[in-house]
């Protein structure tokens, strides 16, 4: 009877505890009625929310420039300042996890739990954090199990240990006490010491099993396979089953324009053999190598074309000079013929001049002799007349 009288004020206190928490809840529900339209109290122009974090809710055109909603550190029964902060529906938490966006400031983790190319994040650390969190959670739940340590053989016979454990854990999370906890406290006074010792040993083994099940449900197992997640795996390129879809290159590319020599040279396919090097980045893509090879071949072909153009230009100049030399030779030969002809004519003129000079000299001598004879005859006639 004494135990039943002691339990009645405890039940009254437990029943009055939820009633004491009711007035703040009513005050929180009544505060939004003071300012029905919080957008009318905004002193900022209508600015749409930032586009980098997509929200599943359609953005309000009268959105507040601040990016955060009601702070989670505030008590749920308090009256949040609706004049300053907008409702949580407008600027909700981003729907994507940190690091999912390629241009996010967070690092992106690889699917196998290893760091990316930057090498800053691993899932092993998060797994360790989860194990620490679960261990602390187990420590917090241990007083609840110890409070149930006085249960007698009733739990061992009926098998209600796990059921009551789930009910008490749910009740502790909700801040209330269930009926099963009360029945456990009532039955605790009726258990014997021997049964309580056996029950404590059973709960210790159950706690270890519960910890193992909880760790297995969270994906953290103490097996040695966990060490494989911390090993850095090389990023390798998977070889394709079919041919590489990149363009095939040729060493004599562009030469088929001048000569059909493309069929004599083998074609190069852009396949890269995957090499497993720890901590190395992926090798260059085949199309990048093909592009470099194409650029190299184009540069070589342009050099060949420029050399060929220079040879053709020099050959054309040589041919032109040869033609001009032939023309000049023909002109020289014609000039030589003309000079020889003129020399012959000069010789003929000289011979004619000499013959004419001879003829003129003979005629002058004859005339001189004839005149002398005439003078002699006149002088003889004059002498004869004088003598007579």
UniProtKB/Swiss-Prot annotation:
- Tell me the segments the record calls region Leucine-zipper: 321-356
Enumerate the UniProt keywords alphabetically: DNA-binding, Nucleus, Plant defense, Stress response, Transcription, Transcription regulation
| Induction or repression | Induced during incompatible interaction with the fungal pathogen Puccinia striiformis. Induced by abscisic acid (ABA), ethylene, cold stress, salt stress and wounding.
Q: Which GO terms describe its molecular function?
A: DNA-binding transcription factor activity; sequence-specific DNA binding; transcription cis-regulatory region binding
Q: Where is the bZIP domain?
A: 293-356
One of the GO BP terms on file = regulation of DNA-templated transcription
Quote the protein name from its UniProt record.
bZIP transcription factor 1-D
As for what it does, the entry says: Probable transcription factor that may be involved in responses to fungal pathogen infection and abiotic stresses.
Polar residues compositional bias: what residue ranges?
169-179, 214-231
Q: At the top level of its lineage, which domain of life is listed? A: Eukaryota
Q: Which PANTHER family match?
A: BZIP TRANSCRIPTION FACTOR 68, G-BOX-BINDING FACTOR 3-RELATED
Q: Where is this region: Basic motif?
A: 295-314
Q: Where in the cell is it found?
A: Nucleus
Tissue expr: Highly expressed in roots and at lower levels in stems and leaves.
Q: Which residue ranges are recorded for the region named Disordered?
A: 1-49, 103-249, 261-316, 348-388
Q: Where is the composition biased (Low complexity)?
A: 23-33, 117-129, 180-193
């Amino acid at each position: 009877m004494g135990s039943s009288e002691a339990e009645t004020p405890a039940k009254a206190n437990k029943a009055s505890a939820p009633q004491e928490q009711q007035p703040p809840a009513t005050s929180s529900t009544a505060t939004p009625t003071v300012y029905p339209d919080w957008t009318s109290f905004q002193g900022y122009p209508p600015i749409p929310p930032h586009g980098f974090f997509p929200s599943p809710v359609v953005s309000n055109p009268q959105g507040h420039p601040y990016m955060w909603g009601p702070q989670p550190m505030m008590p749920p029964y308090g009256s949040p300042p609706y004049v300053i902060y907008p409702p949580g529906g407008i600027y909700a938490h981003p729907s994507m996890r940190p690091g999912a966006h390629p241009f996010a400031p967070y690092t992106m983790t690889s699917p196998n739990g290893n760091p990316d190319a930057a090498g800053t994040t691993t899932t092993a650390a998060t797994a360790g954090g989860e194990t620490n969190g679960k261990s602390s959670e187990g420590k917090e739940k241990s007083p609840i199990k110890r409070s149930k340590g006085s249960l007698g053989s009733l739990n061992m016979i009926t098998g209600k240990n796990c059921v009551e454990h789930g009910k008490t854990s749910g009740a502790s999370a909700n801040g209330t006490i269930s009926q099963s906890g009360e029945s456990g406290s009532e039955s605790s006074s009726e258990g014997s010491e021997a049964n309580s010792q056996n029950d404590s040993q059973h709960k210790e083994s159950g706690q270890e099993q519960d910890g193992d099940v909880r760790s297995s449900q969270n994906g953290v197992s103490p097996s040695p396979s966990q060490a494989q997640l911390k090993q850095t795996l090389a990023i390798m390129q998977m070889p394709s089953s079919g041919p590489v879809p990149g363009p095939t290159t040729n060493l004599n590319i562009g030469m088929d324009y001048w000569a059909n020599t493309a069929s004599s040279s083998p074609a190069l396919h852009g396949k890269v053999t995957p090499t497993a090097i720890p901590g190395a980045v992926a090798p260059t893509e085949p199309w990048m190598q093909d592009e470099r090879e194409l650029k190299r071949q184009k540069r070589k072909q342009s050099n060949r074309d420029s050399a060929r153009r220079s040879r053709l230009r020099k050959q054309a100049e040589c041919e032109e000079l040869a033609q001009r030399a032939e023309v000049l030779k023909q002109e020289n030969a014609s000039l030589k013929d003309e000079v020889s002809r003129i020399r012959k004519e000069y010789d003929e003129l000289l011979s004619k001049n000499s013959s004419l000079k001879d003829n003129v000299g003979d005629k002058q001598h004859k005339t001189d002799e004839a005149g002398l004879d005439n003078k002699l005859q006149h002088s003889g006639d004059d002498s004869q007349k004088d003598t007579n």
